[in-house]
Design a protein with these regions (language model features):
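Active-site and NAD+-binding cores of ADP-ribose-processing enzymes
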Residues: 2-17, 58-157
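NAD-dependent ADP-ribosyltransferases
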Residues: 5, 13-29, 36-37
Length: 157
């Protein structure tokens, strides 16, 4: 299995320590729980970044980092039909934050596979930096990543 993470070049060395998610929280974790967010494809990782463009997050200076996950590594998967109604809404976050934070604390697995809110039939992979099996993953060197400018422009009429 492969995972991909897009991040600012200046954070590449610490992209998988979960510190950003610990400090600010995320869809699948409460503030205080360290976790690294990745996607099963580079395309989904791109979309997951683009949904934050309106939040003022700059997209220049990004790098893509590929992660190889051994096939025999236990991965917990959560399917969309296992989630509470409304899980894709912004106000549906509390249940997801609790679910993810409990998984982090349980150390049940190093990887949690969760449906993307953007495309529920595709998956993001949460990596638990405190799990001993994280050492079994292969983290590749960051590669420069540039967003196609057409993704960021207004449609012309």
């Amino acid at each position: 299995m492969r995972a991909f993470r897009l991040t600012d070049q200046k954070w590449a060395a610490t992209a998988f320590d979960g510190e950003g998610a610990r400090r600010f929280g995320g869809r699948w974790n409460h503030r205080g729980s360290a976790v690294a967010y990745t996607s099963e494809s580079l395309a989904l990782a791109t979309l997951e970044q683009l949904v934050h463009v309106s939040a003022g997050i700059p997209l220049a200076g990004r790098v893509a980092i590929r992660v190889d996950i051994p096939d025999d590594l236990p991965v917990r998967t959560i399917l969309p039909d296992e989630l509470p109604e409304g899980w894709r809404r912004v106000d549906g976050l509390r249940a997801l934050k609790t679910l993810g934070s409990e998984w982090i604390l349980s150390r049940e697995s190093a990887v949690l596979r969760v449906p993307s809110v953007i495309i529920p039939s595709e998956f993001n992979l949460l990596l638990n930096p405190s799990h001993p099996d994280l050492a079994r993953l292969t983290f590749h060197l960051p590669e420069p990543y540039a967003f196609d400018p057409r993704l960021l422009s207004s449609p012309s009429g």
